[in-house]
Amino acid sequence: MREVAVGLLGAGTVGSGVWELLKKNGALIKNKSGIDLRVLKVADKDQKIKKTLGIADEVFTQDPMEVLNNPDIDIVVELIGGTTVAKELILSAAGKKKHIVTANKALLAQYGGEIFDRVLQEEVEIGFEASVGGGIPIIKTIREALVGNRITKIIGILNGTSNFILTKMTREGIDFDRALEQAQALGFAETDPNLDISGGDARHKIAILSSFAFNTVIDHDSVYMEGIDGIDIKDIAYAEEFGFVTKLLAVAQLFDHGILVKVHPTLVNKENPLAAVLWEDNAVMVESDFLGTSMYYGKGAGARPTASAVVADITDIAGRILSRSEYNSKRYAFFSDLQQIAFEKSRTRYYFRFNVLDRPGILSKIAGVLGDNRISIASVIQKEKEEKFEHVPLVMMTHDAVEEDVRKAMKTIDSFPEVEGESRIIRVLVD
């Protein structure tokens, strides 16, 4: 049996996980798949990694071009991150007829079109399972298990940091800042957590996922994004009174006139399976015409889950190399030209919280503005006034409404002298 030679670019958190997995379970992979994987080169700028991971002198290098220029290497695994050097290395690897595996979500979200064009041109394979759901095999599921289905909707909890923070706030009644501090202390949030809490990480992932689910190129910059840093513990508590849990959801939905892709905090009914996805776990719910609703759940980040997905891609590509199967260009070609629907035109239910003076007529005044903008109230909670506060919270749930109508109404309501500050809007998942 011929070995399939692998070159690693980057031996950080994920790269070291891949090295350790192949070292520990290489024989298991060979016995289960008949594929003998050998890491021929590991490139990393940190010389100390060699000793830490026990990498032999002849295998380790600080020059990534030693990996790309090695004629014996079949598969190049890019795990250095970033979008500049990583892009150059991937394009160069494709040009040298190397197959590619990457976990780089930011790179694929921004430059996926260019990278897939090059892959098609050079007739090489690219695996990117780890770029979306960490250890959840959602790309493979969509491309293979659901190949006979027309997918109509994807709803994902795609960022473990945000889910951990929201779970902390919900379960322990602590505010956002304290929950973030605890997430950082436990290693579930970066020192600079902005990409996670802003929704940026989830936006990268849903752009990649929806591109392959709907066979169209999704411009990630046009995906509406709102993070969790504006979520108040009060809103989590009030939402629970209505029977909802707060989650950061990434949603892609197919309509007759196009596709809507968005990321924002969302209230999820407690009976929905997504409400039970806690702490750092991720989940993806897929709606399709023949299978119906299916859900995929697991660890979305971390060295081991991500390494598991990377090695699955390596093994998959290695199998195609050894079988000498005909190159399938359809794996990386997008055949639909769907229009992305503007977020302002989207329709859903809403949660509103106003801080209002406790005066007669304010509820009817607000309801009048909502009615003028075609927004129907489903239920209301008005809390008792506390002695030290002049204003009281007025909380509402609506029926379906259009985003641009909601924004117009809120602008008017927030201008009322009886309303303090900017009112809070959270969208609701319509089951």
Question: Which residue stretches match the model-derived regions?
Answer:
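Substrate-binding/catalytic subdomain of NAD(P)-dependent oxidoreductase enzymes
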Residues: 178-276, 281-283
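Rossmann-fold NAD(P)-binding glycine/threonine-rich loop
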Residues: 86-95, 105-134, 139-143
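Rossmann-like NAD(P)H-binding beta-loop-alpha module
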Residues: 120-201, 208
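N-terminal glycine-/serine-/threonine-rich beta1-alpha1-beta2 phosphate-ribose binding loop
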Residues: 1-96
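A short hydrophobic/small-residue beta-strand
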Residues: 99-101, 377
